[in-house]
Amino acid sequence: MEMRWFLSKIQDDFRGGKINLEKTQRLLEKLDIRCSYIHVKQIFKDNDRLKQGRITIEEFRAIYRIITHREEIIEIFNTYSENRKILLASNLAQFLTQEQYAAEMSKAIAFEIIQKYEPIEEVRKAHQMSLEGFTRYMDSRECLLFKNECRKVYQDMTHPLNDYFISSSHNTYLVSDQLLGPSDLWGYVSALVKGCRCLEIDCWDGAQNEPVVYHGYTLTSKLLFKTVIQAIHKYAFMTSDYPVVLSLENHCSTAQQEVMADNLQATFGESLLSDMLDDFPDTLPSPEALKFKILVKNKKIGTLKETHERKGSDKRGDNQDKETGVKKLPGVMLFKKKKTRKLKIALALSDLVIYTKAEKFKSFQHSRLYQQFNENNSIGETQARKLSKLRVHEFIFHTRKFITRIYPKATRADSSNFNPQEFWNIGCQMVALNFQTPGLPMDLQNGKFLDNGGSGYILKPHFLRESKSYFNPSNIKEGMPITLTIRLISGIQLPLTHSSSNKGDSLVIIEVFGVPNDQMKQQTRVIKKNAFSPRWNETFTFIIHVPELALIRFVVEGQGLIAGNEFLGQYTLPLLCMNKGYRRIPLFSRMGESLEPASLFVYVWYVR
């Protein structure tokens, strides 16, 4: 039956005799079989018996079977098939219930899966599934490790903004290093497409009264401020409906700040939040209440109430140039380190700052006594790390009330990143990373914000929100640990190493990131000279004390005996977004690009 179906699909392509490598690749695509060209090329070479660069229909069938008929899938199929040829709908339902932990399962659902994935018409009409169909199902999105429920916004989005982790970028305009690299609109577009909700804009006076964006006092190139916000306007809500915060690093004169205010209002129109929401006069609004809104984060003159009362009056009337105004209106005069040059705030720009007023962090005690609900702090990673070790309870209390942004230290001229996990552990909402720099920190960032539909907002765990909680990530005294078991079964079409001596020698590392006690990793043995279908069949167990903060990272490396192991691909996701059962893990490159069909095949089980 399968042979008849197979021949009916391919025989027309062999009417002219043999086919070459390119036609082989196209025929596999026609059959909906995903295979990377580099692996097809090698398998083609191995099965071209006459070594003429052309293969027969029988040789193509051998290639097809090598690619699609994986031993580990056949073993599962045979376990549930009564005759090792087909699965009845009841057999499939049993598999989904017992192995895939399907909460709701019936023959009707099994019928739907059969209709969707079974390619052989007569088998499909009989409400049965062949190995061909089962293989296609196991290779589908429905069997990915990442839960379908987490692909949509499922969390309560009506909490105040300070109750969420918010995807945030640092120096968003840069696509390289911070001294000589180019400033590029792609930095903003790329970040927004990835779900970033807080963008940094470094603003300076430009020629012809046009503010520019670049890394000040460096040789990085410049962008017009109005061009930057036009790009943001175009892409702001392409990935997520929830609010975007524009974090202004404002070095402009009052005259060019007024130009900035005009540009913001002209570009964003009604999307720009320029006054308090009626329902939130003294608390931060929720992401839900701020859908499709742009928020400006900057220094501000006076209070929200004063701004609200001033609305409708001439916003160009007073730029607060007089030094005597400083006592009445805090934030008018700023000093940069030991320099005496003061920066004045244009009232027109100040009035656009509503719920995200930038306020210098002084101390936790000062914040408790004086900080207003709409005031946000930005703290450098070095100071934040020191505070998190010496005053962790105060830090967590602070992040329960106020939006806190953590940014990379100034010495990271190469745009490198810190590990964001240590600051998520204490509830910091905006942990700002250099999105242009690939590596472990961005893998964690991308993995964490896969959750909640990639919306860029993730509700913090209750113990980082509730005032009665005494959570300390370094001293876990209570909670409900999870025992996570992962059987790493096999790899599927893994990338090849660049080494000429050990191509195809691969291993997998499984890492856990979370509170300090949960940080751990384990790795498989090396499989030699088989990147196409390595079989490990190794089982690993992890005890995870705070699963709400845990991320799991799978890393595939090529063994390197002299220069060290070579990174080949990775996948990171929140522990609580992992499906149980037999699952496929897609791999991504260091730059975050999909390496499909390269993937891992695992069996996952966990209990709390």
Curated annotation (Swiss-Prot):
It catalyses: a 1,2-diacyl-sn-glycero-3-phospho-(1D-myo-inositol-4,5-bisphosphate) + H2O = 1D-myo-inositol 1,4,5-trisphosphate + a 1,2-diacyl-sn-glycerol + H(+). Expressed specifically in testis and sperm. Weakly expressed in pancreatic-duct cells. Up-regulated in pancreatic-duct cells from patients with cystic fibrosis. Residues 155-299 form the PI-PLC X-box domain. Its EC number is 3.1.4.11. Its cofactor is Ca(2+). The active site is at residues 170, 215. GO terms for molecular function: calcium ion binding; phosphatidylinositol-3-phosphate binding; phosphatidylinositol-4,5-bisphosphate binding; phosphatidylinositol-4,5-bisphosphate phospholipase C activity; phosphatidylinositol-5-phosphate binding. GO terms for biological process: calcium ion transport; egg activation; intracellular signal transduction; lipid catabolic process; positive regulation of cytosolic calcium ion concentration; positive regulation of cytosolic calcium ion concentration involved in egg activation. Residues 305-324 are annotated as: Disordered. Changing residue 453 to D: In SPGF17; uncertain significance. Residues 35-70 form the EF-hand domain. It holds the Pfam family PI-PLC-X. It is found in: Nucleus; Cytoplasm, Perinuclear region. InterPro entries: C2_dom (IPR000008), C2_domain_sf (IPR035892), EF-hand-dom_pair (IPR011992), EF_hand_dom (IPR002048), PI-PLC_fam (IPR001192), PLC-like_Pdiesterase_TIM-brl (IPR017946), PLC_EF-hand-like (IPR015359), PLipase_C_PInositol-sp_X_dom (IPR000909). GO terms for cellular component: cytosol; nucleolus; nucleoplasm; nucleus; perinuclear region of cytoplasm; pronucleus; sperm head. It is linked to Spermatogenic failure 17: An autosomal recessive infertility disorder due to failure of oocyte activation and fertilization by sperm that otherwise exhibits normal morphology. The production of the second messenger molecules diacylglycerol (DAG) and inositol 1,4,5-trisphosphate (IP3) is mediated by activated phosphatidylinositol-specific phospholipase C enzymes. In vitro, hydrolyzes PtdIns(4,5)P2 in a Ca(2+)-dependent manner. Triggers intracellular Ca(2+) oscillations in oocytes solely during M phase and is involved in inducing oocyte activation and initiating embryonic development up to the blastocyst stage. The EF-hand and C2 domains are essential for triggering Ca(2+) oscillating activity and the regulation of PLCZ1 enzyme activity. Interacts via its C2 domain with PtdIns(3)P and, to a lesser extent, PtdIns(5)P in vitro. This is 1-phosphatidylinositol 4,5-bisphosphate phosphodiesterase zeta-1. It comes from Homo sapiens.
